[in-house]
Amino acid sequence: MAIFKVEGGHRLHGSITPQGAKNEALQILCATLLTPERVTVHNIPRILDVMQLIELLRRMGVEVEQLAEDTYSFCAKEIDFEYLRTEDYRRRCTRLRGSVMLIGPMLARFGVGYIPKPGGDKIGRRRLDTHFIGFQKLGAKFNFDIADEFFMVEGKELKGTYMLLDEASVTGTANIVMAAVLAKGSTTIYNAACEPYLQQLCKMLNRMGARISGIASNLLTIEGVDSLGDTEHTLLPDMIEVGSFIGMAAMNQSELTVKNVSFENLGIIPAQFARMGIRFEQRDDDIYIPQQEHYSIDTFLDGSIMTIADAPWPGLTPVLLSIFLVVATQAKGAVLIHQKMFESRLFFVDKLIDMGAQIILCDPHRATVIGHDHRIRLRATRMTSPDIRAGVALLIAAMSAEGVSTIQNIDQIDRGYKDIDGRLNALGARITRIDDCE
């Protein structure tokens, strides 16, 4: 198992470009199953989760060709349904939560979809009810084999309908949209997720011949079509990487430029960093973060402690809360971090407390952080990455700490960040990757 050795106290300097968006990539790659025509996708991040999905598609029978370092073409003329019953298919799907989005395209085009209970980050319960209730409303029959933990959905002729989702699930909305584009008649989805990556999926499907309206709102209307054609698509930059790099610059008192961020698709993220007292400038489509010795957290108008909470888009994406939390440990002032959507994503704060951070874990959803204002440096320690984003938060803490920290289970970080050690070392960080470490 690989580990990181991180020597803290080295400031960053220079510029860095975010990779293509992982969460968009998972949706877009699954959507290639909707057509027998060739779909070319650019700006694909070469990270573990995405590469695993590409290999899974290849084993399912999709013709996959790498055209450039970050460009692949996909042609799903046929699917090997015998493979979907194999242990290899089960094993690969259970490692990747995004594999659940294979069901919608398979159901729409082939009338049946199989998937084992998917895996992914251990960050609490994440229900799949929204996906399957949506399929049932379109006329599909759902079955879950409890013994094998295997989902099967069948529906030879899906029919459009109205549905009000019980939660604005991003993957649930994507799955239902992909099923509905080939259904008969009109489908209306209310309380749909509307984040930029879902918008990108809908725009790509429209270029392929789908008829989706209401894009960027929480009310989508889909007029079913008989078939979809070929297209090319370019992924947006990953907003989570953008936020991570802003946090790194502030925490390490560094001057940094984040290039080609697609600022218009960052939503409330820049404003939330501004509430943390972090200064930055928008320069065309780049974000410049000047070196700051101190940053002060705002308070509410009545003087009460600032709260930063996640919410469905256009609210703050929950995957950045761990970054805000670790950045707050060296801010001036205090902040309440409220993680509403997952109940286990804040448990990594124990390691930050071991490093000397002042954090009160109020309950599984809330933590109060009292910043050191860079008067006291965090202490190096040994820690384990529990999931992708908490792993990067711990990496940020280690980069600013005094001494050499060890981070285990860095495969979790590799799932979401391409060559993160090499890219940060090029900016001045001191991160050593040690492979096959027991």
Mark where each language-model region is.
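Short, structured segments at the rim of ligand-binding sites
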Residues: 1-438
